Structure formats: C-alpha cells, structure tokens
Amino acid sequence: MILNTERLLLRPWNESDAESLYEYAKDPRVGPVAGWPVHTGVENSREIIRTVLSAPETYAVCLKGDDRPVGCVGLSTGERSNLVLPEDEGEIGYWIGVPFWGQGLIPEAVREVIRRAFAELDLTTLWCGYFDGNEQSRRVQEKCGFRYHHTCRDIHWRAMDDIRTEHITRLTREEWEAGTASERKDA
C-alpha cells in the first residue's frame, strides 16, 4: 500500500532503506524520546526494518520526488498495538529525522494514516501516546485532532529498559468526521 499527501509519499519499508534509516536513527534526539534505542549501525537498521518496520501499515515517510525515507508512521491494530485494544481500534506511532523537524511533515503523514484508518479500514477509535517531556509529539497529536484521555505512570518501557510516564490521547471516528466536515465547510 502506498499513500500520497501533498508533499509526501508513504510506502512500505525495504531493506535497501537501511542506510537512510541509520542516518536519522543514529541521532540520540530521535529514538529515545519515541521509546526506542539509538541505532548502532546500518546492519542494526536493516534488522529493525526486517523485524519491526516490515509490519503491516508501517510506512516509510518520503518526500515526494525523493524515495529516501526521512521518517516513519505506523498504525498497529488490536493485539499488535502497545496498548490492549480491540481489533476495530488502532494506535498510531511516528518519528522523523531531525533535519525535517518543524516543517509539519509528520502531522501531514499522520493525517493520511488517520484517513486510511477510518475511511478504508473502518476503525472506530485511534490512540496515540507521548512520553513526559516530548512536547513535539504532544503537539503533533493535538494538530491531528487527538485529545488527552489518560496517563500511565511509572511504566517499565522494555525497549529502553527504563521507567516512564506516558500520556495517552484518543480520536474517535465521529470526532474525525466532524473535523473533516468543518474543514470542508471552511474551504
């Protein structure tokens, strides 16, 4: 599945993307705030593509006209989610390389995955989370219509082997439909 937005192409990851992934995933400002360790080399990135990023509905975020990934957005439904969710609900996760911060690219990618989740996959509810201190992620979620739902304190985050506080946000299909209707009316 390939998704298009105004500026982005969202496509499945390929093992040949390992060098581009490593370029951004080696930066300690990217992975740890999102809940995963800094990549240690191109082979580590290749293994992550094989074992994590090859999951269904996980997309390499590429600028149109350039097939190299600069970030990632993914949708995990039901049991594949980090949360305990029914099959008609999903969780969205994302990250983008530091050179692309502040350009509105991840909100654009997330909005397209939201559209697919509700309009094509017929999900009823989407969830997102951000760790304490990750204000950029909180703002992405707000821009995309997610609203605060609850906080999980003192959770052991296995990928980083540390204790974290995660804030969970939610967007229902009805909220999304109301928001897209008002956007069409304003246009």
Describe the function of each predicted region.
Residues 49-60:
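A short helix-loop-beta-strand connector motif used in the catalytic cores of GNAT acetyltransferases and
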Residues 29-50:
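Conserved GNAT-fold acetyl-CoA-binding loop/helix
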Residues 39-44, 53-55, 105-106, 157-161:
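Short C-terminal domain-edge/linker segments immediately following a structured domain
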Residues 1-33, 62-187:
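Acyl-donor (CoA/ACP) binding surface of acyl/acetyltransferases
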